[in-house]
Regions:
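Loop-centered beta-sheet repeat module
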Residues: 39-84
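Well-ordered alpha-helical scaffold segments within catalytic/enzyme domains
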Residues: 1-7, 50-63, 95-105, 147-158, ...
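Extended glycan-interaction surfaces of carbohydrate-active proteins
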Residues: 16-36, 67-142, 164-211
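Short, surface-exposed loop/turn segments at secondary-structure junctions
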Residues: 5-9, 33-41
Length: 211
């Protein structure tokens, strides 16, 4: 967003250290807990994609070994569009579209179709099938899923669809008191209300729609 994050040579050295670490752990085949900070699993599409997007971005500041890009891209393309070997769909895959902007137009549409067909619910987007977090008679429905979808559709030029998702968010939220999630099939939010993540994305979507 135009912010100058790198202040001096010390900050540049931090980037070099991160690159060395990613190579040392072989990030493309590393077991980690992903965006939801849950069980470790090797090679998550969303995690590999986020790292790849970052590596591409910092190439103008530091040297990124070709192998780090080549290995990551190879595994990413082999896995796409599945999130892991055991999970096809995941809300975290939307991060690859926004804010990472990593995917081609066709890839974006595949991810959007998969999310809307399989994870979309009345009051939000479930993170993945059989998610046990706040699961009461079904997977919890996350408010910010609508915000991500709205922002993405706005960026794709579909203002009507973006507005549709914005109104879905605020339909159950009084005074922008937007929760983390709603219990499955209900208008009942959990106690993490309001959630800064949900609120920030909704404000961003509102800003875009009012430009």
């Amino acid at each position: 967003h135009g912010l100058h994050i790198l202040r001096n040579e010390s900050d540049i050295q931090v980037l070099r250290n991160v690159i060395d670490l990613l190579g040392a752990i072989k990030y493309w085949s590393f077991a980690e807990c992903g965006a939801w900070e849950e069980q470790n699993e090797v090679s998550r599409l969303s995690s590999i994609g986020i790292i790849l997007a970052g590596l591409f971005k910092i190439q103008s500041y530091v040297k990124v070994p070709f192998e780090l890009l080549q290995k990551g891209l190879s595994v990413f393309m082999e896995m796409f569009p599945n999130e892991t070997t055991t999970r096809q769909y995941d809300l975290a895959q939307l991060f690859l579209i926004y804010p990472m902007n990593l995917l081609t137009g066709t890839q974006k549409q595949i991810i959007l179709n998969n999310i809307e067909k399989n994870l979309l619910r009345e009051n939000g987007v479930i993170r993945y099938l059989d998610d046990i977090y706040y699961n009461v008679n079904g997977e919890a429905e996350w408010s910010f899923g609508f915000a991500y979808l709205g922002i993405i559709y706005y960026q794709l030029g579909d203002r009507e669809k973006a507005a549709y998702y914005y109104h879905k968010i605020i339909a159950n939220s009084k005074d922008y008191n937007i929760p983390e999630l709603y219990y499955s099939g209900t208008n009942t939010p959990n106690d993490n209300t309001p959630l800064g993540w949900s609120l920030a994305l909704t404000i961003e979507l509102a800003y875009l729609l009012n430009k």
